[in-house]
């Protein structure tokens, strides 16, 4: 029995035919209400009404209509209807709780719009509610309106059909009901006006001591005083909805197109946007924040772990230098002492993240040449020591292209920086320590382990980060003891430039040729550059062939981090660089970096499982289909491939650089679009869903808010100038499906190209054709004739002229615009306008 699946909680009220019980589903744990309708002693009319309510609810799906779960007829003669539970109670009780204190106008209009959207949905389904009142309007925990109690609703076959049954609540009944006149959807508009008036004044719109006086007040059309605490637009809208004549009342669709209503909807969406942002901040959902905010926070966290070392006894200094093309923050400056952690953090945080014209760093470091027998081992260790941290940081900041060109030159030139440990800035690679005293790298190992779980800071030295902006330290740093001429003889300038062009897409990173820097700063061994470029291209082609080494290389990297540290070699004589050994070292380094790239793919694959969609994966798939086998890798892989080889991108190879910048810009742009769509609330739905959490009732409430925001956004986009309110049909006849463009009001406003194709109607026997079909066919033929004769633009102007109040002026202007066609099409245009305003198909 279905009732056994629910756990009884309490009775929450009594409806028209039975009681309403709050229950809890045993499986999903959600709360529902079961409406038990006693049909044992009910009349045939009441039985039909109860069955109709269950049938209607099962077909209706709208954010502002009570949700339907299931229904069944028990053996005890009761009809059970399971519906969603509205924790806020009904609107009537909510207004009573105000105790005479008026609601804010935005709250009144918010509820008003939600009730109107529910009525519009019902009317599009050809359903009259016929008992709309504040007791049948419910509120959820998040103040979302739910219209319910469709027990006496009636489904009309056509909009021109009228219902003449005298049912409803007297306070909300329209004058035509008491006069026993036919009525249609305008009766629900009257009831809607009564509800809005009650929300605004906390009183019934029409009230009297007895029923006779109440009926007399409604029939005579004596309007109650309009509320003065609200704007005149709202008062005028209430007055039109409570017009005595049904034809003078606006339809629900026209109500939602009023400029005042659309303005209030925009205010509601803006307030929801702000509330969503606060919820995102409160819940700490970093994915719902804008991408720039996340990156900014990451950049700050990278500087929190900076611990300055004491100065050496030699009095070495750190210089901050800049090129002429840099901005104001890149101007040359020098500091005799290292800054404190607070000053360092303040300095780095002042970097302009929106700067798009910064250049990369130009760094000069001391170079130590390893002995021939120890080059391979130290080079491998140097790469493996730095690579895992770089990989983790790449996984943390997917849109950042990090280009470590000093690292490249040191590896390819078989060199290694040797600065005093006291001069070492920890944001650089922790493996670059002095070689003069042969101190191990062990003192800096805890910093590596501390950075990984905390902020995954990028530790390659010196690094360039491009994510639409230059995120890392773009100030130019030069490390080394400059107080003696001997130290200057050991300095070889290792250079790299990263131009972030203003006219390029945000985040575009282009690697320029090394020779563009001042020629005095070129390294001594630049003669091996062509071979290194070929090696780099060969390495990039080999990256796609080592997927099988992912896990093994990853374990080797972690195992190496725990191995004993190696001592740095002593200073050799500068200039004795063996090109053959350098190439051999490049081969060894290529194997290590290739394995590291494979491990980065594994880490990327594991991290991509945490997100529903990955822009990098989509971009990678698209590139694999469009590009040749030599196409550039995605953002993170491109960063690693640049960090591995020791030569910047050649100028005769612009295509891989462009692919790299395209990867960077597209990935960042998609992330920003995703977050902005969350902030703009037309796509704010996923942001709200994340902020509220995917747990039980919170997720259900979030989905309801998302659906409401989507619906209000669609309502806000309705054209207020459209006077043709064609309601779509649930199941239109096939012959009209082919020609819906003639009923679409977009064609009347020039938004759809006019097509003058002829309509061929399928002949139906008149015996089986209902009256509504005949009228529909006539209107279609009339519309086709008018559009052909006048055209879309002229017909739109004629519609505007027909709105003129002065009849004489209207006819004169119609003659001027229509010219010769006035005699033939003036009457047809009036007829078409009348049918489109008063009949819905």
From Swiss-Prot:
SMART domains: S_TKc (SM00220). It comes from the Eukaryota. Residues 517-700 are annotated as: Disordered. ATP binds at residues 12-20, 35. The modification N6-methyllysine is found at residue 622. One of its GO terms (biological process) is DNA damage response. GO terms for molecular function: ATP binding; manganese ion binding; protein serine kinase activity; protein serine/threonine kinase activity. Residues 541-557, 607-616 have a biased composition (Basic and acidic residues). Residues 6-261 form the Protein kinase domain. CDD domains: STKc_Nek4. This is Serine/threonine-protein kinase Nek4. The gene is NEK4.
